[in-house]
């Protein structure tokens, strides 16, 4: 089911670029490998909430995803 992200985002009537999908998957991967695996889905969910809040405030979604990645990187480096 390689087309799962496209199918799911379409069913939710959301736009998901390949870059955004790759970034969120990378974020989840980093969390899964550096902490407990079970935190990866929760981290992806929280990143999504953060992105939605930033976009509602006028930010670009790609920039907001990048910001969420930076926060993960910073926290995992501590």
Each model region followed by its residue ranges:
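Active-site-proximal helix-loop elements at catalytic-domain edges
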Residues: 1-14
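Electropositive phosphate-/nucleotide-binding environments in soluble metabolic enzymes
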Residues: 2, 18, 25, 38-41, ...
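Amphipathic alpha-helical interface segments
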Residues: 47
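A short glycine/serine-rich beta->alpha loop
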Residues: 28-38
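Acidic-glycine-rich active-site phosphate/pyrophosphate-binding loop
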Residues: 13-27, 78
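C-terminal structural segments of small proteins and small subunits
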Residues: 58-78
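Short helix-capping/linker segments at secondary-structure and domain boundaries
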Residues: 36-39, 50-62
């Amino acid at each position: 089911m390689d087309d799962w992200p496209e199918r799911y985002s379409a069913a939710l009537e959301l736009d998901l670029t390949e870059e955004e999908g790759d970034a969120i998957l990378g974020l989840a991967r980093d969390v899964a490998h550096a902490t407990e695996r079970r935190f990866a889905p929760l981290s992806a969910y929280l990143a999504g909430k953060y992105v939605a809040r930033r976009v509602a405030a006028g930010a670009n979604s790609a920039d907001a995803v990048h910001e969420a990645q930076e926060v993960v990187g910073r926290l995992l480096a501590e």
